[in-house]
Amino acid sequence: MTDKIETLSHATKESIKIVISNFENFSMEKYGKVAIIPDLKEAKEEQVFDVLQAWINWNKLKSPTTVKLYFSHLRKYLHYMGVKLNDQDVKQELTFKHKIDEELYGLTVSDIQLILAEMRYKTKVQYLCQLSGLMRIGEVIQLRKKNLVLGKKNIIVKIPPTITKFSKGRTTFFSKEASRMLIPLLKEMDDNDVVFGSSDNPKFTDIKNKDNSISTTKQALRAAVKKADLEMTYESTGRYMINTHAFRAFGITKLSRHDPNFAKKLAGQKGYLLQYDRMTDEEKLNVYEKYESELTIDTTAKQKAEISQLKTDNDELQKLRDMIQDKDKVEKMFKQIKADELRLKELTSRAEAALTALKKANNL
């Protein structure tokens, strides 16, 4: 088991540690001691399942998906410690809450404007970057200045595989609105500094620093949402409708309406067409800029982005018109050439006939 754990990703190993800690906290609260696994080894199977069901119920405030993931990790740990569970018995003896799929709340531009108005400058920039870059919150708070490519109006973001969900690096972009606001902050940073993360303590693990930063940014969001009077919750779970993921979802939704495959590529989701892997950053940015106004929040900036894109579209339309006109000119030229060829053939034929007649006359 130890060897198997060592082959797992760092994030998975940290998750297993969290589950073990969770089970120990449950054991202390329920039975007054942390180490109850030796007791489980000696207990009857029915008693073991009673304890596990009590632990599942103890985690009732967590989502059904999270509890099932926790149990998967815990079961492996129990097996390693000598408590083996049969698959059929698990299905028959344990009851998990079913996931209820409520219709998810979609952020509006108005919502975002109200929330950002209640945030400090750096936090506001962070959420604009997450939204326009279609990034997960865990990716945003782990970005370092060296991951950003400057020099254009849109900052190019090179997300390293070490901080992504599927351990695959990717390229995305920040809107001109977000980039313009981020530049002053970057001027005060060294290349290896985290851009938005609040925790970068070398004494902590990467997971610990990540968790601390996520906790801080969630608190900032909750405070801003409360001030904006937008603290709605889902009836089935009591969870807040507006959370950190809502900003990423806003960007994905807006971009997906125009180009769903490109949206998946930028967001790091599976299932996009491989054609985007063959595009240069410049080509990807050109696609991004076509729909950038959809990812712009400030009303004035949004209007500027729309006007800029309209101008670009008009320029492309004019080029197309010019090409059509040029095509017409070329077609007319070819028609004239063909007409000239026919005329030349006719004149050549007449000349040959005249020459033949002249030769005959001379022979007479």
Regions found by a protein language model. Name each.
Residues M1-E103:
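N-terminal core-binding DNA-recognition domain of tyrosine recombinases/integrases
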Residues V83-L114, I163, P202-K203, I207, ...:
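Flexible interdomain linker/hinge and immediately adjacent N-terminus
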Residues L128, A246-Q269:
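C-terminal catalytic core of tyrosine-transesterase DNA break-rejoin enzymes
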Residues Q142-P184:
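Conserved tyrosine-mediated DNA breakage-rejoining catalytic core shared by Y-recombinases
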Residues S175-G238, G251, D259:
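Active-site/catalytic core of tyrosine-dependent DNA strand-transfer enzymes
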Residues P260, A267-K311:
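Catalytic-site neighborhood detector that most strongly recognizes the C-terminal catalytic loop/helix
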